[in-house]
Amino acid sequence: MAAAGPRRSVRGAVCLHLLLTLVIFSRAGEACKKVILNVPSKLEADKIIGRVNLEECFRSADLIRSSDPDFRVLNDGSVYTARAVALSDKKRSFTIWLSDKRKQTQKEVTVLLEHQKKVSKTRHTRETVLRRAKRRWAPIPCSMQENSLGPFPLFLQQVESDAAQNYTVFYSISGRGVDKEPLNLFYIERDTGNLFCTRPVDREEYDVFDLIAYASTADGYSADLPLPLPIRVEDENDNHPVFTEAIYNFEVLESSRPGTTVGVVCATDRDEPDTMHTRLKYSILQQTPRSPGLFSVHPSTGVITTVSHYLDREVVDKYSLIMKVQDMDGQFFGLIGTSTCIITVTDSNDNAPTFRQNAYEAFVEENAFNVEILRIPIEDKDLINTANWRVNFTILKGNENGHFKISTDKETNEGVLSVVKPLNYEENRQVNLEIGVNNEAPFARDIPRVTALNRALVTVHVRDLDEGPECTPAAQYVRIKENLAVGSKINGYKAYDPENRNGNGLRYKKLHDPKGWITIDEISGSIITSKILDREVETPKNELYNITVLAIDKDDRSCTGTLAVNIEDVNDNPPEILQEYVVICKPKMGYTDILAVDPDEPVHGAPFYFSLPNTSPEISRLWSLTKVNDTAARLSYQKNAGFQEYTIPITVKDRAGQAATKLLRVNLCECTHPTQCRATSRSTGVILGKWAILAILLGIALLFSVLLTLVCGVFGATKGKRFPEDLAQQNLIISNTEAPGDDRVCSANGFMTQTTNNSSQGFCGTMGSGMKNGGQETIEMMKGGNQTLESCRGAGHHHTLDSCRGGHTEVDNCRYTYSEWHSFTQPRLGEKLHRCNQNEDRMPSQDYVLTYNYEGRGSPAGSVGCCSEKQEEDGLDFLNNLEPKFITLAEACTKR
C-alpha cells in the first residue's frame, strides 16, 4: 500500500506535464510577418500610430488582443495608444494575437516600434551600391500619417533611378505640395533622392498628393522618364461626429404601440469613409422628465422608437432626449457628438367623455315647443377643441314620439336638451329619457380601458296649463248616402276639453264647405244636409268631401278639425252612350262599335246590356246589335241597306236594371274614310271655322291698305313740289379747298341776271357761253363735253323763286345734273347780284364789277381780265388829310 502511493503520484505528475505541453503546443500559433512602425519618441494617449494588415495574416480571426496594455488594436488593424508613451533609444515591440474560437487556432503578429531619426546619407556616383536585381524606376507606394507629430522634416522614402548606376543623377519633384498649394510641403534631396515632409497635413483638406519625380544628369539630360509619385495621407480620428441638426422635433401619438417609429436622427463624420473613424453608434444619454425609459434608438440607423404603450399626453405631453453619437463603432475612446431631441406627445381619443352626475331633472310647460329645458355638462381629459374632446349626444330611450331633441354646444361642449314637439300634460305628466354621449372621433385602438357609451337619466316634468279645446283626432270621418233628403241629421265632429275630458260647453262652427251641402248644429256638432248630396257632382269622384270645423269653448279658445264625409253611392244614374253621330263607310266598314259609361260605382255599373227596342220594321230588318264586351256593343247593317242617314234607338241597361234609350244618328255613306262624309251629315247651315274668319279679316285689311295707298298717291301728285328751305340752316358751309381751280374761262355771271343793255328777253343764266331763248341753252366748257339744260320757259325776268316752279326740267342721263340746292340758290343769288349792280337810278353802277358776255373768238374787244376791274387811282389820298375828330381814331387804329 505504501508503494502504491508514490507510483500514483509519479503517474499524475507525468500526465500533468503532458497536459501542459499539449496546452502550450495548442496555444502556440504560427507567427506572421513582422510589422515595423516608425513613430516619434513621445506618443500621446488615444492616438493612432499605424495600421497592421490583419487579414493578410489571419482572415477568420474573431478575437484580437495586444500583449502590451499600452497599445490596443481594433478589428480593422488600427493600432492606438491607450496612454501616453515615451520611447527610449531602444526599440520597443509587442505582439498581436489573432484567435479563431471555432477552429481553435491562433496566430500572432509582431509589431516593432522604431524611433524615427533623420536620414542623412551621401552617395557618390562611383560608390558601389548593392541592389536587388529586379529594382526598376517605377512608382513607389508611399503614405504619411495625418497630423503627424514629426520630428520634421519627416522622412517618407528614398527615390532611386536605374540610371544612377551609370551616371551622376540629380533628383527633383513637382506637383501639389511642392510648387502648387500647399507650397513647400515636400522636398527631395538633390543628390540622395530622400523625400521629406516639412509639416503636418490634414487629410480632410488633402487626402493624396500626386507628385512627379525627375532624374537628370549634371548637364540637364533626363536620365530617366518622370516618375508619378502618389503620397497618400493616412486618416487619423481627429473629427468629432456631428448631428445634422442641433435640435430635432418629433411627434408621437399617445398610447402608441411599442416599436412605433418616432423619428430618425443622423450624424456625419469628416474622417475617411468606411473606416472605424466613421463607423458611428447612436445612443440616448438622458431623458427628461426622468420617468421610466419610454424611447430607444437603433445604434446603427438612428431610428427612435417607443418601448412602452404608457405614453399619456394628459400626464406628460413633451419629452426631451439628449442624443449621443460616437465614432470608432461606439468604443469608449471614440469621439462623441450630442444633440437634443424634443418629442411631443399628440392627443388621441383615449379618454371617454363622462357625465358629472348620473341623473338630471328638467321642467317644461305643456304645449311649449322649440324651447331649451336642460344643459348637460361633460368632462373629457382629451385636448380641448379637437374631435377627441367634442362630443355627440344621443337620446337612447323615451323619445319614441319625437318630442325632444338634444344637440351639442360647440363652445362649452354641453348637451342642450330641447322640446321640439308640444307635450300634453293630460297624456304625459312625466317623461323619462336616457341620454348617451360619445366623442366625434373614434376611440384609440388597443387601449386597455372601457370605451362603452356613457349614459345618464333625465326626468322631464310637464307642467299643467289651462288650455283650450282639443280637436283630436284632427280628421274625423262620417258616411252619408247620396240623394239623402234635405234636413237629414247625422253625427258630426266631436272635440273635447282636456281638463274634464268631455265636450260639454263647446260650440261648433263651419269654416269651409266646398259645395254648401252641410250645416252644423252649434251645440251638438251634428251635421244637417242643406242640399241633395250628389256623389257624381264632386270632383274628383270617389274622393272624400272635406268640411273644416271650428270648436270653441266658453273662453273663446278654439281648435280646428276636419270632417271627412264619405258619400255612399246609390244607383241613380243609367248607362249613357258616348256617341251622338257615327259614319259607316260602305262597303269598307261592316259595323261600328257603340260605347257606354255609367258614373255610378262599379257595383252599379257594368256589365251593360244593349238592345234595339221596338222600332220600325225597317230598322229591325237592316240593323242588328251584338255584344263586344261589358261596356260595348257592335252595330251592324245588312247588305241591302241603302246609303242614307238613319236614326236608330238603342237601349242600355246596367246590372241593377237602370236603363236609358238614346237615338243614335248613323250615316251609311259610300266612302273610304268616315271624314269624307262628315260635312254632308250636318242638317244645319255651314258654320265658319276660326281660320276662315281670320282669312276674311286679313283680306278686308289688305283691301283697305291698297285703297289708302292709291288715295295718298293721288293727293301727292296734285300738290306742288316745294323747294327746300335754306339747307345751310344758319350753319357754316365747309369750303376749305385751297388749291387753284380748273384752267377754264367761265362767265362771271353764273346766275340768272339781267344784261347791262337791259334786254327784255328773259333767260336762265348758266355757266356756258351761248344762249337760246325759250329753248335749250348750250354750255361750252374748256374741259369736259357739252351739257344741255332746258331753260325756263316764257319771257320776262326770272327773279323770284316761283318763276321756275311751273317748268319741267329734263336732264340727259349721261350729262351732269344740278342738285335741288343749286336750283334753289342760283336764281336768288342772281337777283341779289343784279340789284347790287345798279345805282339809285337803276342804272349799271361803276363801283361794281360789270358783266360782259362772251362774244366769240377774235373779238376786237379782247378779254376782260382781273386787272381791268381796278381803277387807275386808289382814291385814298383823303386819308392823309383827316379832320381832327378822325385823327384820334386813326391813331388808335394804327397802334400795335
Swiss-Prot record:
Tissue specificity statement from the Swiss-Prot or TrEMBL entry: Expressed throughout the basal and spinous layer of the epidermis with weak expression in the granular layer (at protein level). Also expressed in the buccal mucosa, esophagus and cervix (at protein level).
S-S pairs: none
Listed PROSITE patterns: CADHERIN_1 (PS00232), CADHERIN_2 (PS50268)
Record GO biological process: cell adhesion; cell-cell adhesion; epithelial cell-cell adhesion; homophilic cell adhesion via plasma membrane adhesion molecules; in utero embryonic development; protein stabilization
Position of the signal peptide: 1-27
Gene3D superfamilies: Cadherins, TCF3-CBD (Catenin binding domain)
SUPFAM superfamilies, sorted: Cadherin-like
Subcellular location(s) per record: Cell membrane; Cell junction, Desmosome; Cytoplasm
Residues excised as propeptide: 28-135
Induction conditions: Induced in the hours following cyclic mechanical strain in keratinocytes.
Sites where a glycan is attached: 166, 392, 546, 629
GO cellular component, one term: plasma membrane
Residue ranges annotated as Cytoplasmic topological domain: 712-896
GO MF annotations in UniProt: calcium ion binding; gamma-catenin binding
Subunit structure: May form homodimers. Interacts with DSG1; there is evidence to suggest that the interaction promotes cell-cell adhesion of keratinocytes.
Described purpose of this protein according to its UniProt entry: A component of desmosome cell-cell junctions which are required for positive regulation of cellular adhesion. Required for cell-cell adhesion in the epidermis, as a result required for the maintenance of the dermal cohesion and the dermal barrier function. Required for cell-cell adhesion of epithelial cell layers surrounding the telogen hair club, as a result plays an important role in telogen hair shaft anchorage. Essential for successful completion of embryo compaction and embryo development.
Entry comment, domain topic: Calcium may be bound by the cadherin-like repeats. Three calcium ions are usually bound at the interface of each cadherin domain and rigidify the connections, imparting a strong curvature to the full-length ectodomain.
Note: There is some evidence to suggest that pemphigus vulgaris antibodies may disrupt cell-cell adhesion via interfering with the interaction between DSC3 and DSG1.
Protein name, entry field: Desmocollin-3
Organism: Homo sapiens
